[in-house]
Amino acid sequence: MSNKNVNVRKSQEITFCLLAGILIFMAMMVAGRAEAGVALGATRVIYPAGQKQVQLAVTNNDENSTYLIQSWVENADGVKDGRFIVTPPLFAMKGKKENTLRILDATNNQLPQDRESLFWMNVKAIPSMDKSKLTENTLQLAIISRIKLYYRPAKLALPPDQAAEKLRFRRSANSLTLINPTPYYLT
């Protein structure tokens, strides 16, 4: 191998290391900014049958921003159907504050009682606008956090902690299929 080839290879390695370092630095900067804003207190909500309500915490981690929070529940197809009511459905949240959403069952026992039912809990955070910037061109994004809401009937045949043991796997050609014979959604 000639000196020229070695120098080119070292130059490529140095360039690669510099680019990787810049990419890592930029990722760390973005991750630091991701801490600010609105966060939900759970990654999913389980609504046990018979309860009057369940709660979901919403936190504004941004010290300097106020958000308008809008929340609602959709069915598994993504359509609002009024089977669950969220209160308050709309409120303003100042910086470094927490509020609790209450989810109320309005199904009148019309959901299947032999298995869980899937819904989507949606929380939209709309940032406030600084009045001094109203004359400027600005881009503001409203973020919707969407988590699963499971309605769990009271008398399911299998306890939830035994559901994972009942899962089965089937292998065929180049795929692996998971078979869930339980009444639970397992995620």
Where are these regions (language model features)?
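N-terminal secretory signal peptides that target proteins for export/translocation
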Residues: M1-E13
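N-terminal signal peptide c-region/cleavage motif recognized by signal peptidases
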Residues: M29-A31
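Beta-sheet-dominated interaction scaffolds and their linkers
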Residues: E35-V58, L158-R171
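Buried hydrophobic-core signal for structured, non-transmembrane domains
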Residues: V54-N60, I103, F119-K124, L176-N180
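Short, acidic/polar linear motifs in exposed loop/turn regions
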Residues: D62-S65, P127, P181-Y184
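Short beta-strand and strand-turn-strand segments in soluble, beta-rich domains
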Residues: L68-Q70, E74-P89, T187
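Intrinsically disordered, low-complexity Pro/Gly/Ser/Thr-rich segments with frequent PxxP/GP/PP motifs
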Residues: D81-N109
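Terminal connector regions
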Residues: N108-A154
